[in-house]
Every structure is written in C-alpha cells, then in structure tokens.
Amino acid sequence: MTTSVKHPLGHRNAWTLAAAGVATALLSMAPAPAAAQQKFVSIGTGGVTGVYYAAGGAICRLVNKDRATHGIRCSVESTGGSVFNANTIKAGELDLGVVQSDVGFNAYNGEGQFKQAGPYPKLRSVFSIHPEPFTVVARKDANIKSFEDLKGKRFNVGNPGSGTRSSMEELLATMGWTLKDFSLASELRPDEHGSAVCDGKIDGFFYGVGHPSANIQDPTTSCGAKLVSLTGPAVDKLVEKYPYYAHATIPAGLYPNNPGETKTYGVTATFVTSADVPDATVYTVVKAVFDNFDDFKKLHPAFANLKPADMVKNGLSAPLHPGAEKYFKEKGLL
C-alpha cells in the first residue's frame, strides 16, 4: 500500500476554508418540503480536525444535496474514533461509521479488543475510503531516528476508543513492550498531539491517518517535527500475520521539513454499517457518493486518488451490505 498524493499540501488556510465549506454546506441547505417523509441517518467519525470527520462530512454533503427527493437527512457526529464507532453501531446508536480495517476485522470476528464482547456478525461493509499509514512524528530535537529510540520517552499512544490506540497496543505487544516502556504514555486526541509536541510536553506521537493530514501538517510546519520510519521485525510479523495490514510509504516532501520518504505500514479507512440498516438507506447513501464521485474526491486531499474499483474490495473486513452490493452490481463494479 503506497500513499501517493498528487497535490501537495497547501497552507493551513486551505484546510480552514475546506472545513468551513463542508460545514456551510451541511448547515445552510434549504429545508426539504414538509410533505417529504424524512429519515435521519448518523455517521460516526473521529475528531473534528481529522480525515474521518472530513469523510463523514463529504458523504453527508452529497446525501443531503438531494434529500428533498429521497427523504434522507444525514448528520455527522464527532466521536472517539474507530472502536467507539463499531461499538456504537452495534448498540444501534449510530447508523454508519468510519473504522480502520483492522478494527472492523476484530469487531466482526470478536478478536483483539472485542474478544470479551464476542463477534459482531451483523457488521457490514459499505465501501473502503483511503489508505491510512501509521505515522510516527517526533520533536525535531528529540534525536528519534527509529521507533526503538522512543523507549523511555514521552509518547502519545492515542485516545481510548480510537483505532490508533488499538493499533498501537497491537504493535507494542508484538514488540514485547508495554505502556510502561515510555516515561509517559499520553492519551491525547489527534487535534491535541501536534501542539503537545511543539510545546515540549511530549516527544512524539503515533497516528493512523490518511495523508495529507492537518494534524501532521501543523507540527511539521510550526516546529519542524520529523516523521520517523516504522519498520523492522515486529512490523514484518504483523503484515505477514494479518490480512488488514500492508507496508506503506509516505511520499517525500509531502510535509514541510521532511524531504525524504517515510517507510511504515498501515490499514485502510472503511465505511461500515449494520445489517439492521435498511437496504434502501444504504443504497441511497452509496449512490449519492458514487454518482457524484468527482465531487467527493475534491472534498479532501486524502481522497484525490481514490478509485471506485478499489473501494468496493480493498480493506473490507466484513461482508458487503446488500444495499451497497446492489448499487455496485448495477454499475458493473462487482
């Protein structure tokens, strides 16, 4: 899996304007006619500065554009991330959500962090979105050349409920490490870890994200933070053992002060739902995205190189929902 982004990351103002555009589109649309019977669907995402929130916003924007016709109103919820989304869909409190492919696999099969809860056989895939290389970022003056150099350092392992945290714990276990191997294992959210690095509160952080990402752009621009390659026997073992992992490369020069490419591994962001969500609802959501695919790709730089043929198969860790399957078959994608 190689992350290749054709358009370099611009200034932060571009991110602010893009986010504002999505928010404005979601909030300013004219109400649907009173005669239309409204159905509300909610999408669980992640922190408001992350790519998951942008993905949910992009999907809802396209769904809501024609809600007067199909009667579905879509809303985005900022959440703790992948694990939270999977659990909340299972509880029936979210209709759809974005989850890492490894989290989806574990939730469906009752493995990893879901072992105690047991399998969730009703989890269904809708489509995959973007690749998510695991990214290690360190303070410029921390002298961190490899992940092993972080032993004894102050390191952010991800907030509870996030896919980042789940993947971090799996990597540590494979390495034979625990959280006690760090002098501080902080649990900051993605919109907090960049400033913590620049303020000298932590030495680095681990983050699974689609690139380019504002939460990595900020510390690399503001204080010259460095991306650290994540390779070695533990990574090779994980990639060989689990179908949802793959080696990945973050392109050279994607972020300021990081002229070389960064070798790592990662997962895929996937859009999921429950088998209990009606086929017609999922069909409508999928149709809104793929009938307006060029518009969808423009709503975040991480979506720029997406291809429908890949999104119907890559990284899907649960069976495809019948509503999604119907649309993809109609379009010859299956």
Where are the predicted features?
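Bilobed "Venus flytrap"/periplasmic-binding protein-like clamshell domains
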Residues: 40-66, 128, 132-199, 294-297, ...
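An extracytoplasmic/periplasmic, membrane-proximal ligand-sensing/linker region
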Residues: 192, 199, 209-227, 237-240, ...
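Bacterial N-terminal signal peptides that target proteins for export
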Residues: 2-21
